[in-house]
C-alpha cells in the first residue's frame, strides 16, 4: 500500500535507477493525509496538497498501480482502505510507509511500517530485506471490567513493556479478552 506522502520519493528513486514497478497489480495507492475533511473538492486550497495528489495520480498512471482516487468511492485512510477493499487478508504481508500499518495485524496479516527506500525496493522487486523478528505472545485472560476498553488494554501492555518494547518483535495477541474483541477493537490494539 502506498500514499501521497512517502511514495513520491520512492517513485523518483525508481526513475533514477531506470527500474519499473515489478508487479503493479500487487500495489494499491490512495490519497490519505492531505485530503481536507471539510470538502474533498479539487483544487485543494493548499497548493502543496494539490501538487501531491497530482504527482501520485501521475505515478500510478505511468506505472499501472491501482489508485483509489477521490472520485472512486474507494479512497480513504491508507490503513483502513486495505481491509475495506479486501486487500488485507489473513496470512498476507502488508507493507506501507505509514506508522499505523500494524493495524492490518488485526486481520491476521503480517504488517510492516517501512521507510521510503524499502518502498522503492518493494515496488521494484516485491521483496525486502528484513532482520528476523522475535515473536512475543501476549495472553490476556478473564473479562474486562465495565469502562475498560481495547485502548486501555494496549496502553497497559505498552506501560508494562515500555515504549521500545516492540522493537525487533512480532506480536501475537491471544486469550479470552482478544477473542471477544470486535474487529474495530482489534484494530485499536494493533
Model-assigned labels for residue ranges:
Residues 1-190:
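Fe-S-dependent hydro-lyases/dehydratases of central metabolism
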Amino acid at each position: 500500500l502506498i500514499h501521497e506522502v512517502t511514495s513520491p520519493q520512492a517513485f523518483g528513486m525508481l526513475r533514477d535507477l531506470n527500474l519499473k514497478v515489478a508487479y503493479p497489480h500487487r500495489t494499491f495507492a490512495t490519497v490519505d493525509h492531505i485530503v481536507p475533511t471539510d470538502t474533498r473538492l479539487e483544487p485543494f486550497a493548499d497548493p502543496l496538497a494539490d501538487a501531491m495528489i497530482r504527482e501520485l495520480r501521475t505515478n500510478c498512471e505511468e506505472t499501472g498501480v491501482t489508485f483509489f482516487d477521490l472520485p472512486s468511492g474507494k479512497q480513504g485512510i491508507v490503513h483502513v482502505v486495505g481491509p475495506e477493499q479486501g486487500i488485507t487478508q489473513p496470512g498476507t504481508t502488508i507493507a506501507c510507509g505509514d506508522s499505523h500499518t500494524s493495524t492490518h495485524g488485526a486481520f491476521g496479516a503480517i504488517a510492516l511500517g517501512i521507510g521510503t527506500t524499502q518502498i522503492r525496493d518493494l515496488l521494484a522487486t516485491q521483496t525486502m530485506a528484513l532482520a528476523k523478528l522475535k515473536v512475543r505472545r501476549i495472553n490476556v485472560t478473564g473479562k474486562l471490567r465495565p469502562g475498560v476498553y481495547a485502548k486501555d488494554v494496549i496502553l497497559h501492555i505498552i506501560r508494562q513493556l515500555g515504549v521500545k518494547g516492540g522493537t525487533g518483535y512480532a506480536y501475537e495477541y491471544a486469550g479470552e479478552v482478544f477473542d471477544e474483541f470486535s474487529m474495530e477493537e482489534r484494530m485499536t490494539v494493533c
